[in-house]
Swiss-Prot record:
GO terms for cellular component: cytoplasm. It comes from the Bacteria. One of its GO terms (molecular function) is imidazolonepropionase activity. InterPro entries: Amidohydro-rel, HutI, Metal-dep_hydrolase_composite, Metal_Hydrolase. This is Imidazolonepropionase. Catalyzes the hydrolytic cleavage of the carbon-nitrogen bond in imidazolone-5-propanoate to yield N-formimidoyl-L-glutamate. It is the third step in the universal histidine degradation pathway. Keywords: Cytoplasm, Histidine metabolism, Hydrolase, Iron, Metal-binding, Zinc. Its cofactor is Zn(2+); Fe(3+).
Length: 407
């Protein structure tokens, strides 16, 4: 073993449904052995193993969890929309804001004008908040370019971020985020551009792991999203969707039936849609930050998701318009207080279920032999405190592929 971590209270989050009353899967007085960036040993402390080993890290009775995974972000963009926040609080309708040049297209304009270097440095700054909350993997979407050139630009920035030694990145193409001004009143033509030009180029250059869509009345229709999914699957890219956020169009059921790793938002999802997620083992990603920021009232169907055993992930949805909040622990708290998840469900939502939402469940999201050695060390007594307490610097360090990065 290259490195050994001792004297820790280990929250493995192993997906073992045979012990439903111990969902945290805690091992007291535990030890982790790491070889070549992967976990080789997990269990109770064995002094005969680590005695005399040259690289032993005494964790001082720290609480250790899998590294957190923020599985839905729009981290790369330029500009901000604080002025729209003020307008909304004064009662100005979003439609009026959009007519004034605001809304998502204001972010599109700013992002198109920014260089790759500018976008990179802005995104790296935003990552700091996620790092402080124990995040070791982040998903990053495009979607503020809406041209071939600018979508590629955003995804190249995500690839640069992935070279950081202390953060792993999963990249998602979200060209079907909004209708660009160049295609006003021509949504089918824009979908053709995505399917025939953007997706093939992204796949050829290996710039994305998934393709996402915004399936809504103010976004794209179910039929248009199906075209995008077909093109993505043809080019061997995973799929996921922004679905049932504002209405129930059936986008979640479509995405699940086509093999989506996750559907996200899902406030208006009905029981038939939930059953489809369960049938196809698709994760429901909850985004309480957007729910809170937009002062929504339609709650996601948590009881139905539990009833049908659909895994629930939690993410920040970090973006300039509806969730400018770079704190995954705040999302855990909101998921508990607003959506009535338990702290155990919240922790599962940012570890093993978040890994599944990105198709990474075989390598991340739990601490077990063979998994990547990504975990977080906390100065806490109980895993419930991760959802309970906010704003206190509880993180001691993050470990990425066995390398330690102190907070």
């Amino acid at each position: 073993m290259d490195r050994i971590f001792t004297n820790l209270n280990l929250v493995t989050m192993k997906t073992d449904l045979s012990t439903p009353n111990d969902g945290y899967q805690i091992i007291q007085d535990a030890m982790i052995g790491v070889t070549n960036g992967k976990v080789e040993y997990v269990g109770h402390s064995c002094p005969e193993i680590f005695h005399g080993h040259p690289d032993v890290i005494d964790c001082g009775n720290a609480l250790v969890t899998p590294g957190f995974i923020d599985c839905h972000t729009h981290l790369i963009f330029a500009g901000n929309r604080a002025n729209e926040f003020e307008q909304r609080l004064q009662g100005v309708p979003y439609q009026d804001i959009a007519r004034q040049g605001g809304g998502i297209l204001s972010t599109v304009n700013a992002t198109r004008q920014a260089s790759e270097d500018e976008l990179y440095h802005l995104a790296v700054q935003r990552l700091e908040g996620l790092k402080r909350d124990g995040v070791t993997t982040v998903e990053i979407k495009s979607g503020y370019g809406l041209t071939l050139y600018d979508e590629l630009k955003m995804l190249r920035v995500a690839k640069r971020i992935a070279k950081l030694p202390d953060m792993k990145v999963s990249s998602t193409l979200l060209a079907a985020h909004a209708l660009p001004p160049e295609y006003k009143d021509k949504p089918d033509d824009y979908i053709t551009l995505i399917c025939d030009s953007i997706i093939p180029t992204v796949a050829e250059q290996k710039l994305a792991d998934h393709v996402d869509v915004f399936c809504e009345g103010i976004g794209f229709s179910v039929e248009q999203c199906q075209r995008v999914f077909d093109a993505a699957l043809t080019h061997e890219l995973g799929i996921k969707g922004h679905t049932e956020q504002l209405s129930n169009l059936g986008g979640s059921a479509l995405a699940a039936s086509m093999g989506a790793d996750s559907v996200d938002h899902i406030e208006y999802l009905d029981e038939d849609g939930v059953k489809s997620l369960a049938k196809h083992n698709t994760v429901a990603t909850l985004l309480p930050g957007a729910f809170y920021f937009l002062r929504e009232t339609q709650l996601p169907p948590i009881d139905l998701l539990r009833k049908h055993h659909v895994p629930m992930a939690i993410s920040t949805d970090f973006n300039p318009g509806t969730s400018p909040i770079a704190s995954l622990r705040m999302m855990m708290n909101m998921a508990c207080t607003l959506f009535r998840l338990t702290p155990e469900e919240a922790l599962r939502g940012v570890t093993c279920n978040a890994a599944q939402a990105l198709g990474l469940q075989s390598s991340r999201g739990q601490i077990s032999v063979g998994m990547e050695a990504d975990f977080a060390l906390w100065q806490l007594d109980s895993p419930a405190e991760l959802s309970y307490r906010l704003g206190v610097p509880d993180l001691i360090a993050r470990v990425v592929d066995g390398d330690v990065f102190y907070n």
